[in-house]
């Protein structure tokens, strides 16, 4: 498991460049030892520095998606059959995921992740789960909205196969999480309907001209 913590200062990233000061926290059982030949060895224990590379690769694209400055290249992090879900939408496939995030600048004057910390749980190279505990900012019709969320990314072969955004860190309502299964199914249908309408309005995930 690796932990990455960072704060995204205001006005430091754009559609073309990203500058983030990253801080990596090492577990306490990380130690250095010297063998008989006097050479230093790292006993990594549960910490493998290579595991941080997945967050290093993904986070710039995630920041672009939530920052309303995504390009078609930012969606290369998803597998072809990937899904995205938050309390408002349920997207299936990269085209629908594009529509979901391309719609942000249509709804908000400004949107971005202002602070985040990352934890990775890899069961094998490229396969596992990444948790992004974050704070998001939106400006809607002149009103400032600040929100905490937990972004859960599930990876297979280094690609995101499932992307969930838990607002207020609460599980998304569905037939499994709702106390009344019927209400959970109704919530699922509502999110799918919202996604379909957004997909049509965003011209079925068409990439914007640069």
Describe each region flagged by the PLM.
Residues 2-210:
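C-terminal and inter-domain tail/linker signature
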């Amino acid at each position: 498991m690796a932990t990455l913590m960072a704060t995204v200062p205001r006005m430091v990233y754009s559609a073309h460049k990203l500058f983030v000061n990253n801080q990596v926290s090492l577990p306490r059982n990380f130690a250095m030892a010297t063998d008989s030949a006097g050479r230093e060895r790292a006993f990594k224990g549960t910490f493998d520095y290579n595991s941080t590379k997945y967050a290093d690769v993904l986070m710039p694209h995630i920041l672009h998606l939530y920052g309303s400055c995504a390009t078609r290249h930012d969606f290369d992090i998803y597998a072809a059959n990937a899904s995205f879900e938050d309390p408002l939408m349920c997207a299936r496939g990269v085209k629908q995921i594009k529509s979901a995030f391309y719609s942000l600048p249509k709804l908000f004057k400004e949107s971005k992740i202002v602070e985040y910390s990352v934890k990775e749980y890899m069961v094998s190279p490229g396969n596992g789960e990444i948790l992004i505990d974050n704070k998001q900012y939106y400006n809607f019709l002149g009103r400032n909205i600040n929100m905490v969320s937990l972004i859960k990314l599930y990876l297979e072969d280094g690609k995101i196969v499932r992307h969930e955004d838990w607002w207020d860190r609460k599980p998304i309502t569905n037939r499994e999480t709702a106390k009344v299964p019927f209400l959970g199914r109704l919530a699922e249908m509502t999110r799918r309907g919202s996604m379909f309408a957004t997909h049509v309005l965003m011209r079925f995930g068409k990439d914007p001209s640069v």
